[in-house]
Design a protein with these regions (language model features):
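Signature of alpha-helical transmembrane segments in polytopic membrane proteins
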Residues: 1-141, 170, 280, 476
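N-terminal hydrophobic signal-anchor/signal peptide
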Residues: 1-21, 25, 77-79, 127-293
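Membrane-cytosol interface motif
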Residues: 86-87, 91, 142-159, 312-335
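Residue-level signature of catalytic and energy-coupling elements of molecular machines
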Residues: 150, 211, 238, 297, ...
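Short, glycine-rich, amphipathic interfacial segments at transmembrane boundaries or analogous
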Residues: 245-247, 251-255, 314-367, 426-444
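Acyl-group handling in specialized metabolite and lipid biosynthesis
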Residues: 273, 447-450
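A hydrophobic, helix-centered structural microdomain
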Residues: 275-342, 461-476
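A short, structured surface patch at a secondary-structure boundary
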Residues: 356-422, 461-469
């Protein structure tokens, strides 16, 4: 199957799935309401129901057109959470348009039907889009070969990022050498390093291959050379991943100055805005209260079971909060009463345990943990009392990993980012492997979170946390 054929089928199937899931929602809503409310069919005149269905179909066509022409969802590859944000934002706008049209037309419509219809739309469309891409991937239609220009640190990071984002559908088949230390036969994660010049592009390489230029900051000559070659030979699918390590990327605005090769990036520190902090705090209060209310029977049951092992059910361990202020981080007790003595004896007699503790402040096979403590830690239920830390304003639902005072030094320059935000019950570290992640990566993830905070990122992390907890990834 040619590239153009695969592209056509991908775009067609994605558009059909969006349209079908969009229109299907109103029929499902009508069936559910007819089943739940016996007099529903008599409440709205038949002609108004028909008009509403026609309006919904019209908006479905418009929505698919918007996804295609304005957002280019059927042609450009975008990351999952970025694409999902654009989908939900678009659907909310179309929901407002629909109710506005019905209000101005003075139709006799059911608010229940409108609410249920659009709740289903917000669920059906993203789910159908995701399922369609999975089917296209299984059929071998969604994938696109990609070649990375560069073999330095930036190219390695680009490769890891692409591998972690399956929604892009990119299959990296090679790296084009950019380093003097590269030798024939070298590879990166089993992918060969290619030594070539622009003549190589004239024969064996498909013009539809995705090229990603990811050279180092000091290799601008190499970058410009390849961009010129791609333009001359008519290669359209070319992306550049510049070296932006350490920069805040979320909500960054880009502009350029006419007739100059100067790009201006306006960076934002979202957590510095009072409106962002107010939104985050309001979300923390509402969500934590709701979770406590729902889980209160479970909290009481766990407290009872922990007390049966002797000692208090909840303990507070000192952690460093926003601005360097210490606070008692609450947890269900998962260790024996004399845990301090047990740890000291273990570290004194076991060099391997000492090395592991000095590296991560954790032990994979910790003898201090009680029988029920193993279950609580595996399921992360030992951290549920931190909901009360969130209510008190000492923590947030999402944030950097709470650390002890001794760890501040290990954060080095990144400690300033840690101190800008409240520690979180969950965060990037928790959804990126937790205890299986090395300490340097933990620090990087905490700093990345603070620099790139947004409410949408918090919501994404919360959804990913549910998946991680259910799979028990990196928990011990």
């Amino acid at each position: 199957m040619t590239f153009l054929t695969r592209n056509f089928y991908s775009s067609l199937f994605l558009a059909i799935s969006d349209f079908v899931s969009f229109t299907l929602s109103i029929y499902v809503a009508k069936i559910l309401l007819s089943f739940m409310l016996k007099e529903f069919d008599d409440y709205i005149p038949a002609q108004h129901v028909t008009a509403l269905v026609l309006l919904h179909w019209t908006l479905a066509f418009c929505c698919v057109g918007w996804f295609s022409i304005r957002l280019r969802h059927y042609y450009y590859r975008k990351t999952f959470w970025f694409e999902l944000k654009e989908i939900l934002r678009t659907l909310v706008i179309f929901a407002v348009i629909e109710i506005a049209v019905m209000a101005f037309a003075e139709w006799n419509f059911s608010r229940y039907m409108w609410i249920l219809t659009w709740l289903l739309v917000l669920i059906f469309v993203p789910c159908a889009r995701m399922m369609t891409k999975r089917v296209l991937t299984v059929l071998g239609i969604w994938q696109r070969d990609a070649i990375i220009i560069g073999t330095g640190k930036n190219a390695h990071e680009a490769y890891k990022a692409i591998q972690s984002e399956k929604n892009l559908g990119l299959n990296v088949t090679g790296f084009i050498s950019s380093e003097l230390t590269d030798k024939p036969g070298d590879s990166i994660d089993g992918i060969p390093i290619i030594f070539c010049d622009d003549l190589w592009l004239l024969t064996p390489c498909d013009k539809k291959t995705q090229f990603i230029v990811a050279v180092e900051a000091h290799q601008s000559d190499i970058r410009n050379y390849w961009l010129r070659v791609f333009m001359i030979h008519g290669y359209r699918y070319v992306s550049v991943i510049p070296t932006l390590r350490g920069m805040p990327l979320d909500s960054t605005d880009m502009s350029f100055i006419f007739s100059h090769e100067v790009m201006i990036l306006r960076v934002h520190q979202n957590l510095a805005k009072w409106s962002s902090r107010l939104l985050k705090r309001a979300f923390d209060i509402v969500a934590s209260l709701g979770i406590i209310a729902i889980l209160s029977p479970l909290l009481l049951y766990i407290s009872f079971k922990v007390r049966k092992d002797g000692g208090p059910a909840i303990y507070g361990h000192e952690r460093i909060g926003k601005g360097g202020r210490p606070f008692k981080c609450l947890k269900f007790r998962s260790m024996v009463i004399n845990s301090k003595e047990v740890l000291e004896e273990l570290l004194a007699n076991n060099p391997e345990a000492r090395a592991e503790w000095d590296e991560t402040f954790k032990l994979k096979n910790d003898p201090r943990i009680t029988r029920i403590g193993h279950l609580l830690r595996k399921t992360s239920m030992d951290e549920l009392p931190q909901l009360f830390n969130v209510l008190k304003g000492e923590m947030s639902l999402v944030g950097p990993r709470p650390i002890i005072n001794a760890e501040l030094e290990r954060y080095s320059d990144e400690v300033d980012y840690y101190l800008l935000s409240k520690p979180g019950m969950t965060g990037l570290w928790q959804v990126s492997g937790r205890s299986d992640v090395d300490y340097e990566t933990r620090v990087y993830l905490d700093a990345w979170y603070v620099k790139n905070w947004s409410m949408w990122n918090d919501i994404a992390i919360l959804f990913k946390t549910v998946s991680v907890v259910l799979r028990k990834d990196g928990a011990y």
